[in-house]
Curated annotation (Swiss-Prot):
It comes from Phoneutria nigriventer (Brazilian armed spider). Insecticidal neurotoxin that reversibly inhibits the N-methyl-D-aspartate (NMDA)-subtype of ionotropic glutamate receptor (GRIN) and inhibits inactivation of insect sodium channels (Nav). Inhibits glutamate uptake in rat brain synaptosomes. In vivo, induces immediate excitatory effects when injected intrathoracically in houseflies and cockroaches. This is Delta-ctenitoxin-Pn1b. It is found in: Secreted. Disulfide bonds join 1-15, 8-21, 12-48, 14-31, 23-29.
């Protein structure tokens, strides 16, 4: 990911929930809710 605010191309498995997330500078997906997203699964818990 080149843009820290860019949305990930795939969903991440965060805390047992599949949820959209934002990309960080690494290639790995970190759990953080995107600013604008349509959830197809329950939101992740705030704390893991």
């Amino acid at each position: 990911c080149g843009d820290i605010n860019a949305a990930c191309k795939e969903d991440c498995d965060c805390c047992g929930y599949t949820t959209a997330c934002d990309c960080y500078w690494s290639s790995s997906c970190k759990c953080r809710e995107a600013a604008i997203v349509i959830y197809t699964a329950p939101k992740k818990k705030l704390t893991c």
